[in-house]
């Protein structure tokens, strides 16, 4: 999976290899996943307006750095509902950006739950969901509604989300033959009004790995969207 986030002067890229083991439990399916990550953090100081004197805390050009990381997660689905928990940035790495700057990446804890609502069309469903995120002293709750179109191996998704007192989000994406591509834009609404937000591009690929009985093992993303 490849993820690219840009917020102001800062960029965050993540390259991930993920594996999930699936098995039946209590009439549903439990997935246990692990992920190996390569994080790339960047600061584009050329975009900053620091005045004539300059600011030594901000680089004068674009600098970047990378570190290895890991994530783990659990996912359970039963009938129309699902829930999951995950911990990203298990190693809580410090990324050296350039020669004198550092970016500390704290652990991120996620909880998500949702429900699949059927419509009159066999190809469409509506999925309301909630995600709770905690990272150090920061807590946020995301409320999202997705419309999902599925036909044979094609799946298209359109979503809108709201984070109370913080942001609104729009997302579009699709999956075909195991390749998933999605784009999301989040605009800040805190303060006097809406301001520029951040973009997210995510590309992932899913394939089945048969290590024993058919259908027991699969490789897939455990990242929550």
Regions found by a protein language model. Give the residues of each.
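Subset of outer-membrane beta-barrel
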Residues: 1-225
